[in-house]
Regions:
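Nucleotide-activated chemistry modules centered on ATP-dependent adenylation/adenylyltransferase
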Residues: 1-209
Length: 209
């Protein structure tokens, strides 16, 4: 159970995608307590995502806390020197994959842990994550009592979230017409079709034949 002798702080984990956007907007509509809204910048977001974050911030007329790790993705990928273990001295973490998503820990989990510990040390923190009801595997993996999933409680599926965001005027400049997910553009969980679109787009930009 949550401790009742500490001040409760309600934090929205805001990635900027359709699910977290729908969750944030509906929480505000429902007059739910929100003390902080946190966006964790991996430095490899789609350019349109940064525009979306600014648009949401203006729409809700509230500050979105933007947190970023000390080093960017390129540095960690290619230049970071490992300090211990069998790979001590090795440069770069290499590209993340399904088994080794070091980027999630470095750019997200460790950053928000440090932020909460620093700013809300003596508080009872409750986080809100945007996981839809049709993502049972993700919901099953996240059973922490300090994390709540309003979308699942509202019985909203992913398509409901997207439609809701569209109805509020948010369209990410058409990104969801091309990609199933809008995390980092280089995310190892990106679907093959999305990776092909990124590949073709960059070939055109670079003028490669």
């Amino acid at each position: 159970m949550l401790e009742t002798n500490k001040k409760q702080i309600h934090i929205v984990s805001f990635s900027g995608g359709k699910d977290s956007t729908a969750m944030l907007l509906k929480m505000i509509e429902n007059n739910m307590q929100i003390d902080d809204i946190i966006f964790l910048d991996t430095t490899v977001e789609f350019p349109e995502m940064y525009e979306h974050i600014d648009k949401v911030e203006k729409y809700i007329n509230r500050k979105i806390t933007k947190l970023k790790a000390e080093k960017d993705f390129e540095y960690m990928l290619l230049h970071y020197e490992k300090k211990k273990g069998k790979n001590k001295g090795q440069k770069g973490y290499s590209f993340p994959d399904f088994r080794n998503r070091w980027c999630t820990n470095y750019f997200k989990k460790s950053i928000i842990r440090k932020y909460i510990k620093s700013k809300y040390r003596n508080c009872e923190v409750i986080e809100y994550h945007g996981i839809a009801v049709d993502e049972p595997d993700r919901l099953a993996k996240n059973k922490e009592k300090i994390i709540k999933y309003p979308l699942a409680e509202w019985n909203m599926i992913e398509q409901d979230c997207l439609n809701y965001c569209y109805s509020k005027g948010f369209n990410w400049d058409g990104l969801y017409e091309k990609f199933a997910r809008l995390s980092c553009w280089c995310c190892p969980l990106q679907r093959l079709g999305g990776l092909k679109i990124i590949y073709i787009k960059n070939i055109l930009i670079c003028g490669i034949n």
